[in-house]
Regions:
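Beta/alpha (TIM)-barrel catalytic core signal, keyed to glycine-rich beta->alpha loops juxtaposed to Asp/Glu
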Residues: 159-187
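Active-site beta->alpha loop and helix N-cap motifs at the rims of alpha/beta catalytic domains
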Residues: 2-161, 178
Length: 187
C-alpha cells in the first residue's frame, strides 16, 4: 500500500502524516470465525520488524467482515500487545456515520491517529456534496485536531470515488486532518 500525502494551505501535512510503506495485514480467523489475536499480533510484529507499517482492517484485511466493536477491540488489543500505534492505519470506514465516528474515536483513544476511511458505499451515485457532508460530519463529531484521515479511493469495490474537487474542498476546510489518500482506483 502506498499513500499520497496532501499539502494544505502551505502547511506540509507530510511532516504530520504516516511515512513509508504500509502493508495490508491479513486478518487470521479461527474456525469459529473469531479473530486469532495471537497470530494477528505476531504478523503485525513481523511486519514492523521488517520496517513496514500496518494497514489493518482494509480490503485485504476483511475489515468489513468485522463489526465496528471487533475492530475497536482489536486496535486496543494490538496496542496493549506493544504494537506501535504510530505505525498503524486502521480502516474505520463504513456506511453508518455514528459507527465510523465511534470506531475512529476508539482508535484515537488507543493512540492511533492515522485512519483509512472508505466513503459510505452502500448507496451508489453519492454526490461530492454528500461525501463532503459525510466527511465533514465525521471530522466535526470526532473533534480531535490530531486525527489524520486518509481517504480510501477504491471505486472498483466501493463504486464511489473521490474527485479532485472534493479532496480540494476538504483540504481547504480541514487542512492537515485530511492527511492523504490511498488510491486503489486501478487506472
Amino acid at each position: 500500500m502506498t499513500t499520497t500525502t496532501t499539502q494544505a494551505s502551505g502547511t506540509a501535512a507530510s511532516s504530520l502524516a504516516m511515512k513509508g510503506v504500509l502493508s495490508p495485514v491479513l486478518t487470521p480467523f479461527r474456525p469459529d470465525l473469531s479473530v486469532h489475536k495471537e497470530l494477528l499480533t505476531a504478523q503485525c510484529q513481523w511486519l514492523l520488524n521488517c520496517n513496514v507499517g500496518l494497514a489493518v482492517f482494509g480490503t485485504n484485511s476483511e475489515g468489513n467482515s468485522l463489526s465496528f466493536g471487533e475492530r475497536a477491540d482489536l486496535v486496543q488489543y494490538l496496542v496493549a500487545q506493544g504494537i506501535d500505534p504510530h505505525r498503524m492505519m486502521p480502516g474505520t470506514g463504513g456506511c453508518a456515520l455514528p459507527d465510523v465516528v465511534s470506531l475512529t474515536q476508539a482508535c484515537l483513544r488507543a493512540g492511533v491517529k492515522d485512519v483509512l476511511v472508505l466513503p459510505p458505499f452502500y448507496y451508489k451515485g453519492v454526490s461530492d456534496d454528500g461525501l463532503y457532508a459525510f466527511f465533514s460530519e465525521l471530522i466535526e463529531r470526532v473533534g480531535d485536531s490530531s486525527l489524520r484521515v486518509y481517504l480510501y479511493h477504491i471505486p472498483p469495490v466501493s463504486q464511489i470515488g473521490f474527485s479532485m474537487d472534493l479532496i480540494e474542498k476538504l483540504l481547504n476546510k480541514y487542512g492537515p486532518v485530511i492527511a492523504g489518500a490511498k488510491d486503489s482506483g486501478g487506472q
